[in-house]
Amino acid sequence: MRQTKTGILLANLGTPDAPTPEAVKRYLKQFLSDRRVVDTPRLLWWPLLRGVILPLRSPRVAKLYQSIWMDGGSPLMVYSREQQQALAARLPDTPVALGMSYGSPSLESAVDELLASDVDHIVVLPLYPQYSCSTVGAVWDELGRILARKRRIPGISFIRDYADDGAYIDALAKSARESFARHGEPDLLLLSYHGIPQRYADEGDDYPQRCRDTTRELVSALGLPPEKVMMTFQSRFGREPWLTPYTDETLKMLGEKGTGHIQVMCPGFAADCLETLEEIAEQNREIFLEAGGKKYAYIQALNATPEHIDMILKLTAPYR
């Protein structure tokens, strides 16, 4: 009997191919056209997206990407490739593919790559520690569309999230401790998660609870008193209310109140990207310092650290 051959698909959001208005426009069009991301009725959304948002937003976002672009591409792509390569090196007999919900490499190209390696079973790991319909749900939807077009469908194991997984929490705690050792222990550790519309949570998305689960476990692992940790939400988009408190408004308030030293971690990002390196490490640093804060440090995402690769190995082990 033929032994089952398993492959691993690491999934993430995606990135423009280049820091140019044209490339950013292509990427944003695909991203903001997904109903999992924006569910505004299409008759209202298409004219707004194509006539206002894409023309105005693309040049501005391209400049932000230019400020963080690396020799190998966007930070998200560079670190995601490093994750893929590091995992493949630890699992020489297991094909590992990388796929993005938007942009390239696509999820479909990742599935095709694994099927070309003659796998019978694919372990899908969306690199979103906290489930949300707008991230993990988008991977699930696209995977279904891809497989619906295939004659041969492999077995699928889909890891929904890992918000309170022990190896994940340990990796975050180690990263925080290293930052404390480098910069000194802060007056406050701010845990900034990507926001979602409040309405999504009201309609059943358990993302806020999964963020609270991560925060609870990380605070416990670090042994910090609750008053030295805050949880906030960043990157809001549009006019409807999003999860609160907002990161930028909180940092301004803390600076004005006299909080001297803050360190910020973004536990929901598996790889550094525009939202961490530009929004948190740069924009929000300025907000805090201009409001009266004295010291601000951003704690990098787990990226391709050995602890992060160990975590991925442990998460996928039961399905390999």
Swiss-Prot record:
One GO molecular-function entry: ferrochelatase activity
Top EC class of this enzyme: lyase
Keywords on record: Cytoplasm, Heme biosynthesis, Iron, Lyase, Metal-binding, Porphyrin biosynthesis
E.C. number(s) listed in UniProt: 4.98.1.1
Compartments where located: Cytoplasm
Annotated Gene3D superfamilies: 3.40.50.1400
Key word Metal-binding present: yes
Disulfide bonds: none
Gene Ontology cellular-component terms listed: cytoplasm
Reactions this protein catalyses: heme b + 2 H(+) = protoporphyrin IX + Fe(2+)
Main location: cytoplasm
Pathway(s): Porphyrin-containing compound metabolism; protoheme biosynthesis; protoheme from protoporphyrin-IX: step 1/1
Record's keyword annotation contains Metal-binding: yes
Binding residue positions for Fe cation: 194, 275
One Pfam family it belongs to: Ferrochelatase
One BP term from GO: heme biosynthetic process
Quaternary structure note: Monomer.
Family stated for the protein in its record: Belongs to the ferrochelatase family.
Role according to the record: Catalyzes the ferrous insertion into protoporphyrin IX.
Protein name: Ferrochelatase
Lineage, opening ranks: Bacteria, Pseudomonadati, Pseudomonadota, Gammaproteobacteria, Enterobacterales
